[in-house]
C-alpha cells in the first residue's frame, strides 16, 4: 500500500529532477529557476526544506547524491555548460552560522562547451568519481584524488559518443568480473535511425573507456537510462526511457568469443517493452534490489514493473500525479512482458506529447 504525500516545493519554474540519498531520508530537487533545494524527512514522515540556494546561471537539469561514506555531497548540472559539486558543512565557531549546517560549492567543472545534461557519481567501490554528459556528445569522467579536499577534481577521461547525450548510468556491480561500465543515452531527434544507447567499458590495459556495445533497436530519443543493482547476477539489466519503457539484459560472452584485449561483448535481449504510458517516458528508476522498476511519463502517472518467477515483467501498480493509486486490473493492462517474434508488432505509434528539452 502506497502512502502519497504532496510537498509544496516552492520552485518558481519546472522541476527537472528529484534525487534521494542512500538512506532515503534526504531528497534534493532542481529546477529551471536555477536553484537546488534539499529536503529532510522528519520522524513523522513529513518532508521539510532545510536548504535552498541558486546553483547555476541556467536551468538545472539534474542533481545527484554521493554515497554517504564521502559525506553529504551533491552534484548538479546545468544549461549553463557547467557541473558543480556541493558539500554540506557545519558552521565553525567563528562563523555566524555556528552550529548550523549549510551547503558550499566545492568546485565547478567547466570543460563542456554545451549544456551539461546529466551527472552521476560512480559506485562507491570506485572511489569518489563522477561522470557528466553533454549536448556536444562527450562523456567526461572526473575523480577527486583526496576525498577530504573536494575542491580538487581531475578530468580522467573524455569519451566521444557522436550523438548529443541526454543521460548516463553507471553499472553498479562491484564484482571484479565486471569492469567499470557506463551506459549513455541520446535524445537526438534528427530524422535518422541511428541507435540511441551506447555502452562503454573501462579497459585496464589501455586505461581508457571503449565502446563495448550499441543497442541497435533503440532508435527513438532516450530521456533516461538506468542499470539495475546487480546483487550477484552474472548478467546486467538496463532500463531505457524513450517513447515507451524497455528492459534489456546484457549477458557477457565468454572471453574466448571476444577479441583479445578488447571490450567485453554481450548477448543482448529485450525482455520487456511497455507502451502503457501512451506518451513519452521521462524517468526510470530501480529499487535497491533491482527487482522493481518505476517509470514516469507525460501521462502524469508513475508505473511500477516487476518480474514474476518466470521472468515475465508485469505492471504491479499505477500512481496518478496527485499520488492516488489506479485500481483495477484492467487499468494495469497486460504489459506484454513476453517478447520474441512479435517485437515488431509492438512498434505501434504513440501519440506522446513533445516537451521542451535541453538543446533548444
From Swiss-Prot:
Component of the Nup107-160 subcomplex of the nuclear pore complex (NPC). The Nup107-160 subcomplex includes NUP160, NUP133, NUP107, NUP98, NUP85, NUP43, NUP37, SEH1 and SEC13. The SEH1 subunit appears to be only weakly associated with the Nup107-160 subcomplex. Component of the GATOR2 subcomplex, composed of MIOS, SEC13, SEH1L, WDR24 and WDR59. The GATOR2 complex interacts with CASTOR1 and CASTOR2; the interaction is negatively regulated by arginine. The GATOR2 complex interacts with SESN1, SESN2 and SESN3; the interaction is negatively regulated by amino acids. GO terms for biological process: attachment of mitotic spindle microtubules to kinetochore; cell division; cellular response to amino acid starvation; cellular response to nutrient levels; defense response to Gram-positive bacterium; mitotic metaphase chromosome alignment; mRNA transport; nuclear pore organization. Pfam families: WD40. The keyword Glycoprotein does not apply. Belongs to the WD repeat SEC13 family. Coiled coil: none annotated. It is found in: Chromosome, Centromere, Kinetochore; Nucleus, Nuclear pore complex; Lysosome membrane. Component of the Nup107-160 subcomplex of the nuclear pore complex (NPC). The Nup107-160 subcomplex is required for the assembly of a functional NPC. The Nup107-160 subcomplex is also required for normal kinetochore microtubule attachment, mitotic progression and chromosome segregation. This subunit plays a role in recruitment of the Nup107-160 subcomplex to the kinetochore. There is a cross-link at residue 12 (Glycyl lysine isopeptide (Lys-Gly) (interchain with G-Cter in SUMO2)). The keyword Membrane applies. It comes from the Eukaryota. Residues 326-360 are annotated as: Disordered. Keywords: Cell cycle, Cell division, Centromere, Chromosome, Chromosome partition, Isopeptide bond, Kinetochore, Lysosome, Membrane, Mitosis, mRNA transport, Nuclear pore complex, Nucleus, Phosphoprotein, Protein transport, Repeat, Translocation, Transport, Ubl conjugation, WD repeat. PANTHER family: NUCLEAR PORE COMPLEX PROTEIN SEC13 / SEH1 FAMILY MEMBER, NUCLEOPORIN SEH1. Residues 327-351 have a biased composition (Low complexity). SUPFAM superfamilies: WD40 repeat-like. The modification Phosphoserine is found at residue 190. The gene is Seh1l. One of its GO terms (molecular function) is structural molecule activity. WD repeats lie at residues 10-49, 55-96, 111-152, 160-210, 217-258, 276-315. GO terms for cellular component: GATOR2 complex; kinetochore; lysosomal membrane; nuclear envelope; nuclear pore; nuclear pore outer ring. It comes from Mus musculus (Mouse). Gene3D superfamilies: YVTN repeat-like/Quinoprotein amine dehydrogenase. The GATOR2 complex is negatively regulated by the upstream amino acid sensors CASTOR1 and SESN2, which sequester the GATOR2 complex in absence of amino acids. In the presence of abundant amino acids, GATOR2 is released from CASTOR1 and SESN2 and activated. This is Nucleoporin SEH1.
